[in-house]
Structure formats: C-alpha cells, structure tokens
From Swiss-Prot:
Species of the source: Oryza sativa subsp. japonica (Rice)
GO cellular component: endoplasmic reticulum membrane; Golgi membrane
Mode of membrane association: Multi-pass membrane protein
GO biological process: vesicle-mediated transport
Single GO term (MF): signaling receptor binding
Name of the protein this chain belongs to: Protein cornichon homolog 2
Gene assigned in the entry: CNIH2
Amino acid sequence: MSIELILWLFSFASIMVLIGLTAYQLICLSDLEFDYINPYDSSSRINSVVLIEYALQGALCASFLLTLHWFPFLVMAPVAYYHGKLYMDRKHLVDVTEIFRQLNWEKKYRMIKLAFYFSLFIITIYRLVMTAVTLFIDEDANLVDTRTI
C-alpha cells in the first residue's frame, strides 16, 4: 500500500471524526437553546471534546506538511493557527456563566467549522479515490509488464 493512500485514509477517518465532534458540539448547543440540558452539562460536554478536536486537526495539518501536500496544508493551516491562538489565550473553553450570552455566536462558529470540515471531506474523498484508482492502474500495468516477459 502506498504512503499516499495511507495518508488519505488517515485524512478521511480524521475528518469524519472532526465532523462528528463538531456536530456533537452543535447538538449540545441546540439542546441548551431549547432547554433540554443545563448550562453546566452543556459546557462540560463541549469542553471535553474541544482539545481532542484541536489535537486531531493539528495532527492532520502536520501530516499534510510532512508529506508535502501543500494545498491541503495551506487550507488547514489558518484554522490550526486559530485553534492554537485560542488555546494559548485560554479562550478555547466554553464558560458556564457566559454560555447563554454567547449561544448564537457559538452556534454560528460551529456551523462555519462544520461547513469547513465538509469541504475538506469532499476534497479528501476526491483525492482518496484518485489515489486508489491511480495505484490500482499502476499495479495493473506492472502486472501486465511482468507477464509479457
């Protein structure tokens, strides 16, 4: 199996997890808006997955940098920088006392991240299929060459 195929499979799985984590955060905020859960539970659930999301997105960005895939790296680098800046400024966690005031902004922020991750998902699926097809065609061509000898 090619390193590039492994990279795109890792990217596919990582982006699926990122979409799931962002959707989970959005569901927690919607439940809070409709008063299904209290602010403490909502903020503790969101805060428990924020660092996982940041670490996974940073690892994915670093893997694109290390494998010299410049376009995905340049697309993901500003988001990784923003996540790092939020973490360094200690603004990455949702505050229990401020969550109702920031509810609309937090939901918009998560929706934008969800749209961003979906666009990355489309790019990743395309690159995964192209890499798999190219790898399959190259192996098929090598197999035909060895049989003719």
